[in-house]
Every structure is written in structure tokens, then in C-alpha cells.
């Protein structure tokens, strides 16, 4: 049975965040990029790529659908230009800036970013939103395998000092904030609980993909106290669309 308790409090060791669709609604900007990219390529179905590739690294999408252009330096340049060329289409996911600022205000680093975007693009999104970047800011340039492979989220949790603890999972409680199937799969494979953000896909889809708790956006989430003894920080969900009942036992 799903939970109905509100507010819901979770004590966690670390939080990992996707960027596109999770912190910033950049999908319209990225869609505009793909349409421009495909204008002189008759074989390239931009609408199909837009539909299927959310959460992928741009390099992986180009390697699959336009392999002649799969050059890392070229792709990095293209993606790095997206915020300047198409940034007017992008806005904060409601509540994201406030939530990130609250995490930044904690006495210890408790959050990281793991995005499929390139470092240049992701840094520019943070600059646009005026969010201080966390120490562990993992991008497409920092991994050999992108989402849905767990490498990005494993790097994030390991960097923060909370690798998977199979003997005692309660000593390494990490949540992933995600909006896309590839990222949800990556987070689950990295041993994390998933906070689904219903910006890109609807409630039923996110439930089907296995999210543990689903929210409309970040406005209903607060950062509570940090406990130095347990090295846990409290996340308080004043409202949510769905939550699994096993969260109470986590």
C-alpha cells in the first residue's frame, strides 16, 4: 500500500541530483537544439530523438542516430552553446534553487550532481540559476558509461563517502532526484532510493519505472536538521504524489 503520511521525513546520508528536468526545465531548449541539428540531415528524425533520448548523454544520442558526427570535442562544443542559444526556453524546476541553497548551507557537503549533460552546459545552467555548484559535480565528461549505467551515481555516492553497503544498507542511505527513465534506472542500479520529479513524465509512468517517492516539483521539500553523530540530514516532504510504504523502514 502507498504511504499517506504527511509530512514524510527521511533521514539520509547523501542526495544526488540530475540536472536537466530535475533542477532546470531545459527540455524545450534541448528540443530546439535537436531540431536545428537535424535541419541539414534528412536521415535524422529530430522528434524521435527528442522523445527517446531524454536523460542520455548527447554524445551517445549522436553516436546512435548521426554517427558521422560522434566526435567528443565537436559534441562538447555543440552542447556548451545550448544555454546561450536556447536558454530563454529554460526555467527553474519550482523550488529547486531554494532546495539546493538549503543543501549548500549545511555544515557538511551532503549533495552531489550527476548529469548526462556536458560540464560546460551543466555549469552554465547553474550559473543561470545562480546556484553554487557542489564539490562533486559529475558530468558526461567524467564517466566512461552514461545513464542508464550506474557509473554517474556510483561516482557521486562514492565521492561523498557513502558507497553501497550491502552488509548494512542503513549506514549508507542515498537518494537520487530524477525525472527520466535512464536516470531512474541508473540510480536504482547504484543502490539508491529514487525521488521522482514529475516534470517530464507523469505519475503512473514514474511509478512504473520504480520511483520510491514522487513529487510534482521541489516546492514541497524542506531540508531539516543535520545530525553529526549519525551523519544524516533530514529531508521533509510536506506533500507528495506517491510514496512506497517501505520508506518508513529505510
From Swiss-Prot:
Subunit structure: Monomer.
Mutant phenotype after disruption: Leads to osmosensitivity.
InterPro entries (alphabetical): HAD-like_sf, HAD-like_SPP, HAD-SF_hydro_IA, HAD_sf, PGP-like_dom2
Positions of post-translational Phosphoserine modification: 90
Name this polypeptide is given: Glycerol-1-phosphate phosphohydrolase 1
Family: Belongs to the HAD-like hydrolase superfamily. DOG/GPP family.
Molecular-function GO terms, alphabetical: glycerol-1-phosphatase activity; glycerol-3-phosphatase activity; metal ion binding
Catalytic function, reaction form: sn-glycerol 1-phosphate + H2O = glycerol + phosphate; sn-glycerol 3-phosphate + H2O = glycerol + phosphate
Functional description taken from the UniProt entry: Major isoform of glycerol-1-phosphate phosphohydrolase involved in glycerol biosynthesis. Plays a role in osmoadaptation and required for adaptation to anaerobic conditions.
Activity dependence on pH, as recorded: Optimum pH is 6.5.
Disulfide bonds: none
Gene Ontology biological process: glycerol biosynthetic process; response to osmotic stress
Encoding gene, per UniProt annotation: GPP1
NCBIfam families with a match to the protein in the record: HAD-SF-IA-v3 (TIGR01509)
Amino acids binding Mg(2+): 18, 20, 179
Named cofactor requirement(s): Mg(2+)
Residue location of crosslink Glycyl lysine isopeptide (Lys-Gly) (interchain with G-Cter in ubiquitin): 64, 144
Extra remark beyond the main annotation: Present with 193000 molecules/cell in log phase SD medium.
Cross-link (Glycyl lysine isopeptide (Lys-Gly) (interchain with G-Cter in SUMO)), chain numbering: 64
Induction: In response to both anaerobic and osmotic stress. Expression seems to be under the control of YIG1.
Active site per UniProt: 18 (nucleophile), 20 (proton donor)
UniProt-listed PANTHER family: FRUCTOSE-1-PHOSPHATE PHOSPHATASE, GLYCEROL-1-PHOSPHATE PHOSPHOHYDROLASE 1-RELATED
Cellular localization per UniProt: Cytoplasm; Nucleus
Any single Gene Ontology cellular-component annotation: cytoplasm
UniProt keyword annotations, A-Z: Cytoplasm, Hydrolase, Isopeptide bond, Magnesium, Metal-binding, Nucleus, Phosphoprotein, Ubl conjugation
E.C. numbers: 3.1.3.21
Transmembrane segments: none
Amino acid at each position: 500500500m502507498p504511504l499517506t503520511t504527511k509530512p514524510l521525513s527521511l533521514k539520509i546520508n547523501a542526495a544526488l541530483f540530475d540536472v536537466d528536468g530535475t533542477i532546470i526545465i531545459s527540455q524545450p531548449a534541448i528540443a530546439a537544439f535537436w531540431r536545428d541539428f537535424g535541419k541539414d540531415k534528412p536521415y535524422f528524425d529530430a522528434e524521435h530523438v527528442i522523445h527517446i533520448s531524454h536523460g542520455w548523454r548527447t554524445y551517445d544520442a549522436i553516436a546512435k542516430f548521426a554517427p558521422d558526427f560522434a566526435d567528443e570535442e565537436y559534441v562538447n562544443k555543440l552542447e556548451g552553446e545550448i544555454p546561450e542559444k536556447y536558454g530563454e526556453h529554460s526555467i527553474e524546476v519550482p523550488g529547486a534553487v531554494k532546495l539546493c541553497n538549503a543543501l549548500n548551507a549545511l555544515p557538511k557537503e551532503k549533495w552531489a550532481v550527476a548529469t548526462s549533460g556536458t560540464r560546460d552546459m551543466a555549469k552554465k545552467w547553474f550559473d543561470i540559476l545562480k546556484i553554487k555548484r557542489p564539490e562533486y559535480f559529475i558530468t558526461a565528461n567524467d564517466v566512461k558509461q552514461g545513464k542508464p549505467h550506474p557509473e554517474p551515481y556510483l561516482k557521486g555516492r562514492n565521492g561523498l563517502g557513502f558507497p553501497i553497503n550491502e552488509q548494512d544498507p542503513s549506514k549508507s542511505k542515498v537518494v537520487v532526484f530524477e525525472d527520466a527513465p535512464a536516470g531512474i534506472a541508473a540510480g536504482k542500479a547504484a543502490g539508491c532510493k529514487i525521488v521522482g520529479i514529475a516534470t517530464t513524465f507523469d505519475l503512473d509512468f514514474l511509478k512504473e519505472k520504480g520511483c520510491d517517492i514522487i513529487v510534482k516539483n521541489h516546492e514541497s521539500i524542506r531540508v531539516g536538521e543535520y545530525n553529526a553523530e549519525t551523519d544524516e540530514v533530514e529531508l521533509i516532504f510536506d506533500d507528495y504524489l506517491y510514496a512506497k510504504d517501505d520508506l518508513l523502514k529505510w
